Swiss-Prot record:
Keywords associated with the record: Lyase, Magnesium, Manganese, Metal-binding, Riboflavin biosynthesis
EC numbers for this chain: 4.1.99.12
Residue sites binding D-ribulose 5-phosphate per the record: R28, E29, D33, R141, A142, G143, H144, T145, E165
Molecular function in Gene Ontology: 3,4-dihydroxy-2-butanone-4-phosphate synthase activity; GTP cyclohydrolase II activity; magnesium ion binding; manganese ion binding
Pathway membership, UniProt: Cofactor biosynthesis; riboflavin biosynthesis; 2-hydroxy-3-oxobutyl phosphate from D-ribulose 5-phosphate: step 1/1
Taxonomic source organism: Neisseria meningitidis serogroup A / serotype 4A (strain DSM 15465 / Z2491)
Superkingdom as given in the UniProt entry: Bacteria
GO annotation, cellular component aspect: cytosol
Chain's gene name: ribB
Designated name of the protein: 3,4-dihydroxy-2-butanone 4-phosphate synthase
Renumbered residue ranges of the record's region DHBP synthase: 1-202
Cofactor(s) annotated in UniProt: Mg(2+); Mn(2+)
Cofactor binding, note field: Binds 2 divalent metal cations per subunit. Magnesium or manganese.
Amino acid sequence: MSHISPIPEILADIKVGKMVIITDAEDRENEGDLLMAAQFVTPEAINFMIKHARGLVCLPMDGEMVEKLGLPMMTQKNGAQYGTNFTVSIEAAHGITTGISAADRALTIQTAVSPTAKPEDIVQPGHIFPLRAQKGGVLVRAGHTEAGVDLAQMNGLIPAAVICEIINDDGTMARMPELMKFAEEHKLKIGTITDLIEYRSRTESLLEDMGNAPVQTPWGEFQQHVYVDKLSGETHLALVKGTPSADTETLVRVHEPFSVMDFIQANPRHSWSLPKALERVQQAESGVVILLHRTEDGASLLDRTLPKGANQAYKWDSKSYGIGAQILAGLNVKKLRVLGQPSSFTGLTGFGLEVVGFEEAEK
């Protein structure tokens, strides 16, 4: 087997309890995970994962399942590079020995994903690592956690999966050439998160387009587009200059969180202040500035006003990528020239977007 399987074929294998390999983007973790629907897990499946894949066996679940089990997050301040939402590790409360064997780990997973599972059915810590998927799945965050829950959910299965990173014999991460060989050897299909995003995007949107109207700003007239986030209920704005074309580069600035401090702060934490971004787009007579709303409580607003926090670089919320990407795709933007410092943007290709360059703010 030497090709990427389309998502319908991946879904078909997941539905009958088979494992698949799911890969993410080269500019993200650039790894492949063994993945199967959690409700079909067996000791044999766990043994295959730990023997052949060698990574950490994790249990992606949707938020409702995590809350049902009363699982706290592993840390209140997530410093992981890609924001993976680990809860505390778990073990089945009954029927296991040390918890580490393939049979024990399978029983822990079976217990946790049972429709009748209760908090007292599991204990912490343990040898299985649950992951809380973002609501909205890969349309919000392009991770294996969300892909696992999506693939189960799209088949009408319990919204949980078992995943394990594939590692080479020498301890390095398996990349696509090794993953192709692994898939052929074990007769497994390979799917990509990018394809899953594209597949869902054809028929789904997490945003409701509320319409648009011209708006006057100190930097000229823009067309203001208003969107409501179906998951959070928050309102997002896009200020558009000109008519974006799929064939030409579009200046793009995605600004989040949108706050009064973006107007009055002399040294904002964003590389491009909002006024500078609007001025630059006005000069170019073409571009899009997106204002993503996120609730900012008193403590975080106070932190931004104090000297110690005023110049701290802003850390993007992983949910911002998916929401911003959907807005841009809906505006017919395809080729992005980003107003910002060079960085990687995960999962954009699944939305039909391409970053062709960056433009840093003048100091």
